[in-house]
């Protein structure tokens, strides 16, 4: 009966479990206690390795006497849990032998089952499992001295490769959770399957008993003994004192070139690692394989030659986009060698440590392959360079980059390595420039070159600008000079305009402007925009000076050039070609009239109420305006009417030397007022342009001062009778609406 049940258990377990790979022969007998060294990552070019070191040093444990319940025979299954996480389980391993026990024997024999070749005995956590200590369970019959339980210790020269197996698939895709291989039993999540076995010869029955997640504590462990009989199940719990010397999980980086070990997680006092003994042994002889990430498990059901536990290796050669492959070959009875293709200089040292010379380069990757009894695993990491993407290609769920800086072929690993799958990258200068790649960066955006700061000069479609409309315009900061659509001004409307701060010179729609609307340089933060369908007419306004909070505006709907513009206010004579809009007034050219060449809508103060002359005298009786540019027609009395009123044709032939009656008093008062305003505006302009640095007025000071001088005693005959004075040419403002007569 006993042999039958034992064979049944073996058959059941054989259908579930894979065949593990045994350690190389040189790896046996080198590690005291539990030493599980997991290769977290390496950089073969720069010569450093990153390991996860799981250790647990145990002292001898004393077992108390177990009371036996009534019954002639009982089978015991002993499981010892000493872990922090679920996923460990006791189980009866294949290859175990039991010593028959006499029922009268006061003491049974304890036996620690050795593993046969090809069967896994020790525990191996998954990659990224950083808080677990995985013991190897032992089968104990009866009571008495159980001996020492060594976690992962190599016993009798034979041990199994630490192997984790998820029932769902080779990469842990199933529902297994944290299933691990313990003594030939597979655990899935919190459910532990325990194989039971009878020790007697009379009526022993055997059945698996599930145990829901019983876990012991560090220090004193609890062991469960389950007795299975024909009649009942009797559980007897015994206490055993287990003193754990040290246990924990550390991470360290080992640099073979300098023979140095850097602890990146943990403490030096707990780790007990020296580069002379254990580290080299771990590198050369322990369970270190290099393979593809994203799994803590080997392929279930794989052969012993190709079943390799993959871990993480990331190789980052700088400046070589295609040189990114590491091929590690696990030789039976030999050490693990990282051998780039085409570089035979990489080999094994005498003590089993891998020698990787500096300056070596890696060739193109190759897929997984298994040749001639050797398990060859190749893991490739692609590197993109020169295409706006930098950093590393992280492998696995917990990619925590380590940065490596080399100086003269010697490297020093940083202390930022923590748990998880560590993909290492080296930040070294490239061969093609001072390019330093930091780990974990995503796409790097390209910063394009910007033009002049916040400046735009835009000439839009279908623009036929007039000569000097906006050309040569100097616009101070915070202002915009705009010639809007369907503008047809006369020559020089906006040309040469000087606009002080806080003002805007605007020529509104439906006024046709003349050529050269835009040919000017815009200062910072301004635009000069000549918009669509602009056909300007030359020289409508020249050098308009708009005072604070005022605008010089030309109204739309200008009619034929034969009619003069009717200004609301007109300046005093001898303006020197400069239209001055006094305070509180606006210069407007009303609809229904377009100025003749040289006739400009100008701003002037309202006439004095003392003027009582006949309108017919001022207006005249002729509505036909000759095409002489020197004819000065004006509807002066229009200013006395309401703003929107129009007077049909209001031009008189004003010949030279003719004086209108009643204009003397009005002329005197207007001149005095204009002189005052001109002085104020001139001082204001000089102050504004002196502070802003844009430049002074376009006209020299003499042009402004002489005609407008308050103490000038000469009459206006000389000024208005002469054509050579104050730069009055065809392209400039001529506009005094009372003609060129002496006063």
Swiss-Prot record:
This is Ovocleidin-116. It is found in: Secreted, Extracellular space, Extracellular matrix. Transmembrane segments: none annotated. Keywords: Disulfide bond, Extracellular matrix, Glycoprotein, Secreted, Signal. InterPro entries: MEPE. Residues 68-225, 333-356, 385-454, 505-534, 549-577, 628-649, 692-743 are annotated as: Disordered. One of its GO terms (biological process) is shell calcification. It comes from Gallus gallus (Chicken). Belongs to the osteoregulin family. Residues 1-18 form the signal peptide. In the eggshell, expressed mainly in the palisade and mammillary layers. Expression also detected in the hypertrophic zone of the epiphyseal growth plate, and in cortical and medullary bone (at protein level). Highly expressed in uterus. Not detected in the proximal oviduct, liver, magnum, duodenum and kidney. Residues 169-179 have a biased composition (Gly residues). Residues 549-558 have a biased composition (Basic and acidic residues). The keyword Disulfide bond applies. Residues 129-141, 421-431 have a biased composition (Polar residues). Residues 402-420 have a biased composition (Low complexity). GO terms for cellular component: extracellular matrix; extracellular region; extracellular space; secretory granule. Major component of the eggshell matrix. May play an important role in the regulation of calcite growth during eggshell calcification. May also regulate the mineralization process in developing and growing bones. GO terms for molecular function: extracellular matrix protein binding. Disulfide bonds join 31-42. Asn-62 is fully glycosylated, whereas only less than 10% of Asn-293 seem to be glycosylated. Glycans are attached at residues 62, 293.
């Amino acid at each position: 009966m006993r042999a039958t049940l034992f064979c049944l258990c073996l058959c059941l377990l054989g259908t579930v479990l894979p065949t593990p790979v045994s350690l190389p022969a040189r790896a046996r007998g080198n590690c005291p206690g539990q030493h599980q060294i997991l290769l977290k990552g390496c950089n073969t070019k720069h010569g450093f390795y990153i390991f996860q070191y799981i250790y647990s040093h145990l002292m001898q444990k004393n077992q108390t006497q177990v009371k036996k319940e009534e019954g002639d025979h009982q089978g015991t299954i002993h499981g010892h849990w000493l872990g922090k996480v679920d996923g460990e389980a006791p189980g009866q391993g294949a290859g175990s032998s039991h010593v028959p026990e006499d029922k009268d024997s006061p003491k049974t024999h304890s036996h620690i089952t050795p593993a046969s070749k090809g069967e896994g005995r020790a525990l191996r956590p998954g990659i990224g499992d950083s808080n677990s200590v995985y013991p190897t369970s032992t089968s104990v019959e009866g009571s008495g001295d159980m001996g020492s339980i060594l976690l992962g210790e190599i016993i009798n020269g034979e041990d199994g490769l630490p192997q984790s197996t998820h029932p769902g698939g080779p990469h842990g895709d199933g529902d297994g959770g944290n299933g691990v291989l313990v003594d030939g039993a597979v655990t899935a999540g919190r459910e532990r399957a325990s194989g039971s076995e009878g020790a007697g010869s009379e009526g022993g029955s055997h059945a698996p008993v599930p145990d829901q997640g019983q876990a012991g504590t560090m220090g004193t462990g609890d062991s469960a003994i389950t007795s299975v009989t024909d009649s009942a199940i009797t559980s007897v719990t015994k206490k055993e004192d287990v003193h754990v010397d040290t246990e924990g999980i550390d991470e360290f980086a080992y640099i073979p070139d300098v023979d140095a070990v850097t602890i990146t997680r943990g403490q030096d006092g707990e780790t007990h690692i020296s580069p002379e003994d254990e580290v080299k042994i771990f590198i050369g002889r322990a369970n270190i394989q290099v393979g593809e990430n994203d799994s803590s498990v080997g392929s279930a059901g794989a052969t012993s030659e190709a079943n390799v536990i993959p871990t993480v290796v990331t190789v980052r050669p700088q400046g070589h986009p295609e040189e990114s492959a590491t091929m590690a070959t696990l030789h039976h009875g030999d050490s693990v060698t990282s051998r780039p293709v085409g570089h035979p200089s990489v080999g094994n040292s005498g003590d089993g440590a891998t020698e990787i010379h500096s300056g070596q380069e890696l060739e193109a990757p190759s897929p997984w392959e298994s040749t001639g009894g050797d398990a060859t695993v190749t893991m490739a990491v692609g590197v993109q360079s020169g295409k706006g993407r930098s950093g590393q290609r992280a492998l696995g769920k917990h990619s925590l980059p380590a940065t490596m800086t080399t100086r003269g072929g010697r490297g020093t690993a940083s202390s930022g390595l923590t748990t998880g799958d560590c993909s290492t990258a080296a930040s070294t200068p490239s061969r093609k420039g001072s390019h330093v790649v930091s780990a974990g960066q995503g796409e790097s955006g390209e910063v394009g070159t910007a033009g002049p700061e916040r400046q735009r000069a835009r000439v839009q479609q279908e623009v036929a600008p007039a000569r000097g409309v906006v050309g040569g315009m100097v616009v101070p900061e915070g202002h915009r000079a705009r010639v809007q659509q369907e503008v047809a001004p006369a020559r020089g409307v906006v040309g040469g305009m000087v606009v002080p701060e806080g003002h805007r010179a605007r020529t509104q729609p439906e006024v046709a402007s003349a050529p050269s609307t835009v040919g000017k340089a815009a200062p910072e933060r301004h635009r000069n925009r000549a918009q669509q369908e602009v056909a300007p007419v030359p020289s409508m306004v020249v050098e308009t000076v708009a005072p604070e909070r005022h605008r010089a505006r030309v109204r739309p709907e200008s009619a034929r050039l034969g009619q003069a513009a009717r200004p609301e206010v007109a300046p005093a004579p001898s303006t020197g070609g400069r239209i001055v809009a006094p305070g509180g007034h606006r210069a407007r050219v009303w609809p229904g009239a377009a100025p003749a060449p040289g006739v400009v809508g100008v701003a002037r103060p309202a006439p004095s109420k003392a003027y009582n002359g006949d309108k017919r005298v001022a207006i005249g009786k002729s509505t036909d305006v000759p095409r002489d540019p020197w004819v000065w027609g004006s509807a002066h009395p229009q200013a006395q009417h309401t703003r929107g009123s129009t007077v049909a044709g209001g031009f008189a032939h004003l010949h030279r030397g003719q004086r209108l009656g009643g204009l003397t008093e009005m002329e005197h008062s207007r001149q005095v007022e204009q002189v005052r305003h001109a002085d104020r505006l001139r001082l204001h302009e000089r102050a504004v342009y002196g502070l802003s640095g844009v430049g002074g007025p376009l006209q020299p000071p003499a042009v402004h001062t002489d005609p407008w001088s308050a103490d000038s005693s000469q009459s206006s005959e000389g000024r208005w009778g002469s054509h050579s004075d104050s730069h009055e040419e065809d392209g400039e403002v001529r506009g005094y609406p009372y003609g060129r007569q002496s006063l």
